[in-house]
């Protein structure tokens, strides 16, 4: 611990030692950083000195990954494997050059073989990512382990600079927990310190407030107003404890002489998360079609459904769930516009707020889609009370294929402050 590592095995041991120490002092979601970039010099030195070959190095990484995942149930929060133990692969260095190397491929091979859910891989990709590495990543993902997640680093880094991160720092983008971007070694960003912004609360409140003669445009404006109020209610200043051990690993803290959680880092942006956007969009699409355009359902029935969980209205539940040909995830002009307007409402509201003196970012992904769903009432997209909300930027309909979902996600315009994780999840049977 008192000197630089002299070999790959020493580097791995040091990482495991400090990783264990961080968990023991109460830190959770301890990310592992850019392991292929960090470990490669030690691997290269060992190979050149004939101390190690490819398979032996792969064996060392295997033991490291198995050890990290051994206590996954204890480390996990909402779901088993939700430990935040992410290994980041690929991406560019500070000179803009791709860092893919033998360890990048080694990690991908290893996870393809082990099929473990924890730790996980994040693969930073760009236009120069080698095709061979892409193919290895797809093979790894296809085995069902959930790794790697793909990070569109070019777009993310551009938006980080626009938001306030320095251009010379964003090459070293990492993640806090699962997908929320930050700068490794210079950030103390808290990317999910607030309860999630529950999008469907805006419609539920609107239904209780509105008059039945209000037209759809008026309802939509009321929903937007309530969504802004919901957003303002969750963004608050937080009282953080001191963290001497974490401060030792933050170069900004060492330079400033201040604690990690008390203005020692170069960046301390707080992050909010929008939960259930697909549910709200589909609910509004159903109201537009079946209440205002076709007159099949009244607003009174909609209120009753939310209050009674579709009691005596199973036919309407099926109608709302399956019949509408316009759904979140489809590249339909109005679906995209409605989604964009709701995202814009949150963005505009967040843009006027601060937390602990710093600007706030938000994302369209939230890990609480199960826990918040358990205590939420029914929604007008066919979801029963207690059921999970939609996962991130993902369709609720199995008829929308992955290509269309990706087209939809790429067709959205993400505001500069919509930077706290925008994940497309898709389950392939």
What do the PLM-derived regions correspond to, one by one?
Residues 1-429:
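Conserved catalytic cores of very large enzyme subunits
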